[in-house]
């Protein structure tokens, strides 16, 4: 594969394939979230090491070819996608849009609107794949890559060894760039301004997600020696905890820039007073739809049935979350850990206790 060893500028995307993968991933998380209807056993072989590339909806011709050539990578594409969705759900857990899609919605519905939510979806899943592939390389699970080949950082102390097995972030970035962007290269529609607008937006946000992982990667060091001494000091490159990536992208979601696309396919800020976006900013071209009500056309679930916080003035409060429809208070029984005790050695053992609590549910 060409171009997997250096950082390049962004080019096209993949979201239909990712959303297809979600159908198996998210049936394990919550049945109503992002379900597309393809069974896991049809996507992966019995051992989770073989992917049936011809069974996957949404792949372009080049993506299908890459899927066959790099078949062992696809399991980690799914794992990264799953990680991205779970982080998306956590980041938006108290919002009207909580990274959910109606179970009967097709995967292209979430991308029918070029909103801030679509921007975040592209970025977080793209970043998830980069981290998943980078760590799979380090673990020796992929034949095409291994430990990071990054050069020794200039600021590293002379008595520290550079050579521990680090996450192969450069290969992971290159593979994600090549695979994710293949769909846009295959399905170009230069005369359709709407398609060009979405393509330019998605290209940018995918790169923002990838670069979020690349730029947050850091040097990690460890001491080795007899009886706790630090006679040997070893350092390596490590990708960050994914929550760090989620937090960064959530902030960029809040600060996302509204764009317009010129007849030449170039993105420009919609308002002249706005700054030009950097390659790590999120951008969008459409206003967000109404997430208060069910919208089958766009696969929006609405907020009816969502739990709200009675005393909160934020979006998770009953006043905002329920969109003025009011709420119902119910006494429900929950199971919580209790009577926890430290056991030698070394874990905490808890009992499971039932407790009745009040919950407020949007009408």
Curated annotation (Swiss-Prot):
Family classification: Belongs to the Wnt family.
Species whose genome carries this gene: Halocynthia roretzi
Function: Ligand for members of the frizzled family of seven transmembrane receptors. Probable developmental protein. May be a signaling molecule which affects the development of discrete regions of tissues. Is likely to signal over only few cell diameters.
TM annotation in the entry: none
Name assigned to this protein: Protein Wnt-5
Subcellular locations according to the entry: Secreted, Extracellular space, Extracellular matrix
PTM comment: Palmitoleoylation is required for efficient binding to frizzled receptors. Depalmitoleoylation leads to Wnt signaling pathway inhibition.
Keywords in alphabetical order: Developmental protein, Disulfide bond, Extracellular matrix, Glycoprotein, Lipoprotein, Secreted, Signal, Wnt signaling pathway
Biological process (GO), any one: neuron differentiation
Disulfide partners: 88-99, 137-145, 147-165, 221-235, 223-230, 292-323, 308-318, 322-362, 338-353, 340-350, 345-346
Tagged with keyword Lipoprotein: yes
Main location: secreted
Lineage top rank: taxon: Eukaryota
Signal peptide bounds: 1-27
A single cellular component GO annotation: extracellular space
MF annotations from Gene Ontology: cytokine activity; frizzled binding
Sugar-modified residues: 48, 98
O-palmitoleoyl serine lipid sites: 227
